[in-house]
Every structure is written in structure tokens, then in C-alpha cells.
Curated annotation (Swiss-Prot):
Function per UniProt: Probable transcription factor involved in somatic embryogenesis. Acts as a positive regulator of BHLH109.
Gene3D superfamilies assigned to the protein according to its UniProt record, in alphabetical order: 1.20.5.170
Region described as Leucine-zipper: 76-90
Disulphide linkage map: none
Organism: Arabidopsis thaliana (Mouse-ear cress)
Region annotated Basic motif, chain positions: 50-72
Highest taxon in the source lineage: Eukaryota
Domain bZIP as annotated: residue spans: 48-97
Location (main, coarse): nucleus
InterPro entries associated with the record: bZIP, bZIP_sf
Pfam family, one: bZIP_1
Cell compartment(s), UniProt: Nucleus
Official protein name in the record: Basic leucine zipper 4
An example molecular function term from Gene Ontology annotations: DNA-binding transcription factor activity
Amino acid sequence: MFYTNMETVHNCFNDATITGDEIIDILAFLQSDESDNPSGINEVVPVDDKKRRRTISNRESAKRSRMKKKKRFEELTEEVNRLNIRNQELKNRLANVVSCGNFISRENNRLKTESVCLEIRLLELYRFLVAMQSPISTSVNYITTLEI
């Protein structure tokens, strides 16, 4: 909205009038202040330039965020692989321990059975020995022992 020399702008606060030429003069004064400032301090940056810089900054931030997320995903993937390998190793060890435990249990049962058989055989031999040492009816005891 540009005003011509004829139009006036009314200020709502103090009812003073400002002409279009006065507005143009004020804007020119503000722009000349910016160009006269060699240090660049308090320099007004155009809105488009600010928007462009903000857009670039946002893109870089989003890129960093994506890279960080990708790196974290890769770290987690490596950890999953490492844990899967460790899990398989533990499963193999467990299977080996269970297998050894089963073997030991079977061997223990076999030895118990063998022990009972040997005790029975020992008892038979003891009876036979007693029968052989006793003079009375040696032949009857011998036959009885053999039948058992």
C-alpha cells in the first residue's frame, strides 16, 4: 500500500497526520542508516534472507538428526547381532550340559543296577561258601544254592 502525495495517514494515538511523502522520507532515512553503518551492527536482514537461512539451518538440523538416528539404528543392529550370537553360544552350552547330564544319569542308573546285581551275586557266593563249610548235608545245600 503506497500512498501518493495527496493521501494522508492518520495516526490513531495522537491524531497527527503523516503524508505519503513523509512515510517515503522516513523509509529512505532508515535505509540510508543501514547502508551508512560500516560495521554491520543492527543491520536489518531482509525477510527472504532470514527465511532462506532458517530453511538451510532446518535442513542441516534434520540431516544431523537423520544421521544420528541412522547411527543409533546401526549400533542397535550390531548389538542385536552380537546378542544373537551370544544367545546361540549359550544354547549350545546348555544343550551340551543337558547331554552330559543325561549321560551321567544313565551311567548312574547302570551302575546302580550293576551294584544290585553284584550284591545279589555276592550273597549267592556267600551262601555257597557257607554251604561248603558246613559238614551236614553239604550236597543238599549245594543243590539248593545252585537252584537259586
